[in-house]
Amino acid sequence: MKMTTSEIDGIRNFIALLNSKKDSMVVVEGKRDSAALKKLGFSGMICEFHSFKGLVKFADSMDSYKRLILLLDLDRKGRYLTSKIISQLEHRIRIDLSFKRKLAMIMRGKIRHIEDLSMYESPE
């Protein structure tokens, strides 16, 4: 897919801002989402939701983190999982949805899955 200069700059700034959140765990749905973020230069901690056997085990393993940045897909399943995670963890851990909103604004609906970001590699 072809990206505009503003989208490329937006993604670079997005990844830089995400990298600056050292005390946070970024939560994605699966391996391809994780790989896409790493391919774009993300170097922080990533947790793949689907590597856990259910929401309760996921929630129990997140207790040691101060903040979770949820970057689940922008589709129906991603919205459902986001609401379930929030209802399970909102009283125990700070949950940050601002990055999900920023990404949606940058991409203006062009992507619905985090893994699709890997198609947007830009030449340096």
Would you name each region that the model predicts?
Residues M1-M25, K31-A35, F58-A59:
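Phosphate-handling DNA/RNA-contact segment within nucleic-acid enzymes
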Residues K31-L40, M45, F49-E124:
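TOPRIM fold recognition
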